[in-house]
């Protein structure tokens, strides 16, 4: 399990081009999402929140998120998939957190609906998958 997922980390800039900035932490290459990537130079240290996006890429978001490991926050349900759970927008770029059907009521007619707000925190399983955990 990767212990930087879902938390704030500091990593060194190892590569940059016109579109992307990359940092490395503990041998892991991470794409940086920042409004001003041109401000960073090779060798600079960057602090940000690390997660895996929907394209299965490690991403570091330099803007501190409203939720992270151990910190609960509100997110909006954006989709419901009855064989998986509910997808919640928590403000991470390119990633919605899923609250597993295992953590939801047995009866799907009482599940949260699109537009509902949930109080959740991210968790990481032993396969480095991030899930939303209800308060």
Walk through the language-model features, giving the residues of each.
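Short boundary/loop segments of OB/S1/cold-shock single-stranded nucleic-acid-binding domains
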Residues: 1-6, 53-74, 133-135
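Conserved hydrophobic positions within beta-strands
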Residues: 13, 50, 75-77
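Short aromatic-glycine-enriched beta-strand elements
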Residues: 18-23, 84-87
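Short nucleic-acid-contacting surface segments enriched for D/E, G, S/T with interspersed K/R
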Residues: 6-8, 36-48, 105-121
